[in-house]
Amino acid sequence: LTAVQLDLKKGLITFEELVQYYLNQIENTRDLNAYVEVYEKEALKRASELDKKYKENPESVGKLFGMVVAIKDVICYKDHEVTAASKILEGFTSLFSATAIERILHEDAIIIGRVNCDQFAMGSTNENSIYGAVRNAANKNHVAGGSSGGSAVAVQADTCLAALGSDTG
């Protein structure tokens, strides 16, 4: 994050260019099945707003400016679908945002999409999902592992700077 923030401060990259880079990476790694939904328009709009905010007053941005984040499909994000990778929740739209979401947005992170997981986050291979198995970016013949495999692979494949996962442990 520090390197990205430094590049933004130096004007070497804009927030929009950063988001577009990650959107391209997502498109180029679709076969890994990490993402179940990409918030392309929303992420680009937020990036544009942050470009303007930073240009007007660099001190006004939050601690997580430049952090492009994917969120596991069990974490509620208001007005966005959340299915916990289960057919029973297909089409369910969250009525609220989880505290973690509220906090990262407050600090100017950009949420780029929702990532795959084991159904109801109960599993250790990330193969039990209505969206299909997540593939390991290092070796597509291997599983991603963990119920947060979509989150892990999203970072591993350089499709976001960070991803929220969970542990039901």
Language model features with spans:
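Short, conserved beta-strand segments within well-ordered enzyme catalytic domains
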Residues: 35-36, 63-64, 68-70, 110, ...
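Conserved hydrophobic/aromatic pocket- or pore-lining residues that grip, position, or stack substrates
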Residues: 22, 43, 72, 104, ...
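Enzymes and membrane/adaptor proteins characterized by extended Gly/Ser/Thr/Asp/Glu-rich
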Residues: 30, 63-100, 124
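Immediate post-signal peptide segment of exported/extracytoplasmic ligand-binding proteins
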Residues: 50-68
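Short alpha-helical functional segments enriched in proximate histidine and acidic residues
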Residues: 25, 29, 46, 50-53, ...
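Short glycine/serine-rich loop segments
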Residues: 96-98, 102-169
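An N-terminal boundary/leader segment
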Residues: 1-45
